[in-house]
């Protein structure tokens, strides 16, 4: 792990800082934007042959020309030019890359409590001095003005356990009498607050370690502490009651959470305890527990662990170390949900390789080399590793399944917290065929969370995050299949608090790689830049709608907006303008054709049949269609629009697109034009326009490609029928159509898993099929009112 002082990380707490954070941009109010986009007299026609460079240029000006008054007061100077906007993004990306690539053992804030226990270790050479004097110095330098020690976020449990421990450490070496006095006064004046403390925010092992600290304080003769206070006596009683329920020999048999608080357990058989020591020398990654073990055993592995933790944490000790697994997994999760992971693909690959290397058959814990695993880190690991193509066995979750069918964060859990079960739910949604443990996990997690929400009993003891409950509610309403990337990001901006999140362990702590304001600042700037470009593309789409007389085919502008939204919410990157435009146009033109062929008009049935056949079998000869057909207004408009759609590309791409449309026409003629063929056409079009096919048309006949095409066709045809009939049935967070669910799982498996034998098709090609399928599922799952809200959030709502 790099020094905690690197990258401007302060040592108390170790949280990332930037002298000039990226500006938060604000777009004009929605009413202005909406009116501007929908009133043709508000702007000059752009012409439907607009190109990517033109859009990008106008977008840069849009982002950069914001008034200074629109920029938050605390985020530095206003961004006024395209160069400044791009520079802000580039600086933030560079900063985050450096942060991630120097993560090492993971960054975590120093814990006063653990630092105090380590400070008690006497010099190994027998001198009357601490072995780790830097810990004593850290304590002396980090007392708060009110006499307490702890996180700036006030919680009486955190302040009491930290302050008691710091007072004991200072008194043990008879230094800083003034600080001891202030600390004692704080405890005496505030201990009564424990009676009304928020039980959900009680620090881990509080009732186990407090009596042990108090006994040490008594032995040191510290005067003035409220030893006889009723609340203190109650804590002693609670500890006795809890420990009486645990068989004495259990602690020696296998790793349990008791190893995290050895300093609070009293007499132990240390020979047996040492057999449960982790490979890095720690006891469940706890510096305080390991320090106590060293004081009892003088074990050299314990010492090496403590020495390493103190050296890498600015002279203090965190509440847990290392946090390499925890930091990496949650950092990836945050970057993905904020919509900025594309900037950090090499770093994410590096992180996931590390997680894969330390993975065990029972999962993982917050730090590597731990015999103990928990469902939180394991669930997050399963989801992210599977999502990125790693071959991971979800049966690790069986380790957390109890005899009654319930899942628990770890054995012996007294109160089940919400966030680990929510992460279990997230992992369980990424299910491949035959993964029964994930089916069981889905049902349990969904019902557990729904019941807790319904009864207003959501309890969270691992993190203090203001909007966690809202995040969970949304996650249950919007499962992974029905979530589009930019919709997820738009909502996550509301929930992600950056450095405002506080984590709960033995003490409160901060995680810069997880909770980082620069992440959000970069995400907001990027979202606004993308949104501005999407708005200009929407202007262009409206011009195309008018010039192509799309309305005459019974297609409303709102339907056009939905088609464009699905594209923009899925492939949102600024450089993918061409793909977004083709996505929306392909959906609309295919509907125009079906509308023309199905509605009564001036053409006879025989003429329409002739036109239909010529479309399907002689696309290259569109100009040769007889004059009778061209003379019909709608037929002429349709032919012109269709021809323009194909001719916007080079000859070879146009040739490939014509082939894709020919296949679609054949299926339409065979009566398969009810969604499935549309999805297949869309996936083929996107892969062609993105250059994935290029001069290698053999890909189109590859076994994986044809299987994906077939699955996408079949699933999306069924989803279209469901959408039309509005009969999507959901139970326990899963659709009741088991056949379709199994097909969806097969598609996801084929897309995400890397081919074991090699020779598979490019991952980006496969991802296109998943993206298209998810938009069909999205439309079948969500009501129109919900979709309207999402359209507003993604395309028009300013993000600040």
Swiss-Prot record:
Any GO molecular function: terpene synthase activity
Keywords: Chloroplast, Isomerase, Magnesium, Metal-binding, Plastid, Transit peptide
Residues spanned by motif DXDD motif: 374-377
Catalysed reaction equations from the record: (2E,6E,10E)-geranylgeranyl diphosphate = (+)-copalyl diphosphate
Compartments where found: Plastid, Chloroplast
Pfam family, one: Terpene_synth
Signal sequence segment: none
UniProt-annotated binding residues for Mg(2+): 374, 376
Residues noted as binding substrate in the record, renumbered to the chain: 242, 461
One GO term (biological process): miltiradiene biosynthetic process
Presequence range in chain numbering: 1-38
Cofactor needs: Mg(2+)
Main location group: plastid
Annotated pathway: Secondary metabolite biosynthesis; terpenoid biosynthesis
Keyword Chloroplast attached: yes
Family to which the UniProt record says this protein belongs: Belongs to the terpene synthase family. Tpsc subfamily.
Free-text domain note: The Asp-Xaa-Asp-Asp (DXDD) motif is important for the catalytic activity, presumably through binding to Mg(2+).
Official protein name in the record: Copalyl diphosphate synthase 2, chloroplastic
Organism: Isodon japonicus (Scutellaria japonica)
């Amino acid at each position: 792990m790099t020094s905690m002082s690197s990258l401007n990380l302060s040592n108390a707490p170790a949280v990332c800082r930037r002298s000039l954070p990226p500006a938060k941009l604000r777009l004009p109010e929605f009413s202005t934007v909406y009116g501007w986009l929908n009133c043709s007299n508000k702007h000059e026609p752009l012409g439907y042959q607009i190109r990517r460079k033109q859009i990008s240029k106008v977008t840069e000006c849009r982002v950069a020309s914001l008034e200074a008054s629109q920029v938050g007061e605390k985020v530095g100077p206003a961004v006024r030019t395209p160069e400044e906007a791009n520079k802000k993004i580039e600086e933030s990306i560079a900063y985050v890359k450096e942060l991630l690539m120097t993560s090492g053992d993971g960054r975590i804030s120093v814990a006063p409590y653990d630092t105090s226990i380590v400070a008690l270790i006497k010099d190994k050479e027998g001198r009357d001095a601490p072995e780790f004097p830097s810990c004593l110095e850290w304590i002396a330098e980090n007392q708060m003005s009110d006499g307490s020690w702890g996180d700036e976020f006030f919680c009486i449990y955190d302040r009491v356990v930290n302050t008691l421990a710091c007072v004991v450490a200072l008194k043990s070496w008879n230094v800083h009498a003034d600080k001891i006095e202030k600390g004692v006064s704080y405890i005496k004046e505030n201990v009564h607050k424990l009676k009304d403390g928020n039980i959900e925010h009680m620090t881990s092992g509080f009732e186990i370690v407090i009596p042990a600290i108090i006994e040490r304080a008594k032995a040191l003769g510290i005067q003035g502490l409220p030893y006889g206070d009723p609340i203190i006596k109650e804590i002693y009683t609670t500890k006795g009651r809890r420990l009486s329920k645990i068989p004495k020999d259990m602690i020696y048999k296998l790793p349990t959470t008791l190893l995290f608080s050895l300093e609070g357990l009293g007499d132990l058989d240390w020979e047996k305890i040492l057999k449960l020591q982790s490979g890095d020398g720690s006891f469940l990654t706890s510096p305080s527990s390991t320090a106590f073990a060293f004081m009892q055993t003088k074990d050299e592995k314990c010492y090496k662990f403590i020495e390493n933790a103190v050296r890498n944490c600015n002279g203090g000790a965190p509440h847990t170390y290392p946090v390499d697994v925890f930091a990496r997994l949650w950092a990836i999760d945050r970057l993905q949900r904020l919509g900025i992971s594309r900037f950090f693909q090499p770093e994410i690959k590096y992180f996931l390789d590390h997680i894969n290397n330390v993975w065990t058959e029972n999962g993982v814990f917050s730090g590597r080399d731990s015999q103990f695993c928990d469902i939180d880190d394991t669930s997050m690991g399963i989801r992210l590793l599977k999502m990125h193509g790693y071959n991971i066995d979800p049966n690790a979750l069986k380790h957390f399944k109890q005899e009654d069918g319930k899942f628990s964060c770890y054995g012996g859990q007294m109160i089940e917290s919400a966030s680990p079960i929510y992460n279990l739910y997230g992992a369980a949604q990424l299910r491949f065929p035959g993964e029964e443990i994930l089916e069981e996990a889905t049902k349990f997690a969904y019902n557990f969370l729904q019941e807790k929400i319904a009864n207003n009993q959501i309890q969270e003891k691992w993190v203090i995050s203001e909007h966690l409950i809202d995040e969970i509610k949304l996650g249950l309403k919007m499962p992974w299949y029905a979530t589009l990337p930019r919709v997820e990001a738009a909502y996550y901006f509301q929930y992600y608090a950056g450095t405002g999140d506080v984590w709960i362990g033995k003490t409160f702590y901060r995680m810069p790689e997880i909770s980082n304001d620069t992440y959000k600042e970069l995400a907001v700037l990027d979202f606004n830049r993308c949104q501005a470009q999407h708005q200009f593309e929407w202007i262009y789409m409206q011009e195309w709608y008018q010039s192509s007389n799309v309305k005459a085919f019974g297609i409303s502008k709102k339907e056009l907006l939905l088609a464009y939204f699905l594209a923009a919410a899925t492939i949102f990157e600024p450089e993918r303008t061409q793909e977004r435009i083709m996505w929306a146009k392909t959906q609309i033109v295919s509907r125009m054709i079906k509308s023309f062929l199905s509605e009564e008009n001036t053409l006879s049935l025989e003429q329409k049949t002739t036109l239909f056949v010529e479309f399907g079998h002689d696309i290259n000869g569109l100009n040769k269609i007889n004059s009778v057909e061209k003379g019909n207004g709608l037929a002429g408009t349709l032919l012109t629009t269709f021809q323009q759609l194909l001719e916007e590309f080079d000859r070879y791409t146009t040739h490939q697109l014509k082939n894709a449309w020919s296949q679609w026409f054949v299926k339409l003629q065979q009566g398969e034009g009810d969604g499935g063929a549309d999805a297949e056409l869309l996936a083929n079009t996107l892969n062609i326009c993105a250059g994935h096919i290029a001069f290698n048309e053999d890909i189109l006949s590859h076994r994986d490609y044809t299987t994906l095409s077939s699955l996408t066709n079949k699933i999306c045809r069924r989803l279209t029928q469901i959408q039309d009939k509005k009969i999507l049935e959901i139970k326990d967070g899963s659709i009741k159509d088991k056949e379709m669910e199994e097909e969806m799982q097969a598609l996801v498996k084929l897309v995400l898993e890397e081919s074991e034998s090699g020779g598979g098709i490019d991952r980006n090609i496969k991802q296109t099929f998943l993206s298209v399928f998810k938009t069909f599922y999205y439309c079948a799952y969500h009501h129109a009112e919900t979709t309207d809200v999402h359209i507003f959030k993604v395309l028009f709502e300013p993000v600040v």
